[in-house]
UniProtKB/Swiss-Prot annotation:
NAD(+) binds at residues 29-57, 99, 138. It comes from Homo sapiens (Human). This is L-lactate dehydrogenase A-like 6A. It is found in: Cytoplasm. The modification Phosphotyrosine is found at residue 239.
Length: 332
């Protein structure tokens, strides 16, 4: 019996789908779904895969996304509880984990999420042994270390979203004070994605003009303009959003899409992301924290050797020590 499809379409050649930019997102909570939307809007993937243990929510989110396909050039979107669906991914983004509670620091989350990673990582590496891993789950620096150890991947292919968002917040707050768009404000936050992060005031500039040349005490407690409050807002804003709306999602998802674009398009842009930092700035342990990295199709290809002041380097070492105090107690 003839069907509409057979009457409409004549097969011309057999084809086998080959996905060059397959992205898998593990976890369809508020962050995972926001990452999916941000990546779809940038048109970065030719197949997007969603994985979650909550099958009902997973199917609902997948259908909701699929039904928007007429409004954008949407790739194939598939989902499953089974990690087989992630096979041959170019990039796997991990957002799954226990949600941060009100008043809970990112470091308090760690042991609850380590056990979740022990279930996820072996499944991911089994089906996508050549993928890059982008870790988003908090505490992101320690869990990027956990993913590196559990996966056995080379260090360049295990990346934490780290301080890419912190640096964006930093630039935004600087821009708000100066009346300049954040894109034109250049500055980095390094170290832990969290309370011990380090603002690199010595490198903050607008159009190549270092703000430290205009105010040598910028960012210190001697600064009459109290620019240190900018960094305090970077740290507190995440907690404030969790208190007000229960979670954060849009800022981090746009940050993840930004990192994804650099990786899949081999842009070799510089991002402050979490990577193995042993041997840098006097750090002697296998600590993952954010330093400026060049991102491309092989993950982290190079690091930028930023010259820090003695005070900034001391703060970075203290940030590493903060992470090490937790990390050394982990049971992998």
């Amino acid at each position: 019996m003839a069907t509409i499809k057979s009457e409409l379409i004549k097969n011309f050649a057999e084809e086998e789908a080959i996905h060059h930019n397959k992205i898998s997102i593990v976890g369809t909570g508020s962050v995972g779904v926001a990452c999916a939307i941000s990546i779809l809007l940038k048109g970065l993937s030719d197949e997007l895969v969603l994985v979650d243990v909550d099958e009902g929510k997973l199917k609902g989110e997948t259908m909701d996304l699929q039904h928007g396909s007429p409004f954008m050039k949407m790739p194939n979107i598939v989902s499953s509880k089974d990690y087989l669906v992630t096979a041959n991914s170019n990039l796997v983004i991990i957002t799954a984990g226990a949600r941060q509670k009100k008043g809970e620091t990112r470091l308090d989350l760690v042991q609850r999420n380590v056990s979740i990673f022990k279930l996820m990582i072996p499944n991911i590496t089994q089906y996508s042994p050549h993928c890059k891993l982008l870790i988003v789950t908090n505490p992101v620096d320690i869990l990027t270390y956990v993913a590196w150890k559990l996966s056995g991947f080379p260090k360049n292919r295990v990346i934490g979203s780290g301080c890419n968002l912190d640096s964006a917040r930093f630039r935004y707050f600087i821009g708000q004070r100066l009346g300049i768009h954040s894109e034109s404000c250049h500055g980095l936050i390094l170290g832990e994605h969290g309370d011990s992060s380090v603002p690199v005031w010595s490198g903050v500039n607008i159009a190549g003009v270092p703000l430290k040349d205009l105010n040598p005490d910028i960012g210190t407690d001697k600064d009459p303009e109290q620019w240190e409050n900018v960094h305090k807002k970077v740290i507190s804003s995440g907690y404030e959003m969790v208190k007000m709306k229960g979670y954060t999602s849009w800022g981090i998802s746009l940050s993840v899409a930004d990192l994804t674009e650099s990786i899949l398009k081999n842009l070799r842009r510089v991002h402050p992301v979490s990577t193995l930092s042993k041997g840098l700035y006097g750090i002697n342990e296998d600590i993952f924290l954010s330093v400026p990295c060049i991102l491309g199709e092989n993950g982290i290809t190079d690091l930028i050797k930023v010259k820090l002041t003695l005070e900034e380097e001391a703060c970075l070492q203290k940030s590493a020590e903060t992470l090490w105090e937790i990390q050394k107690e982990l049971k992998l």
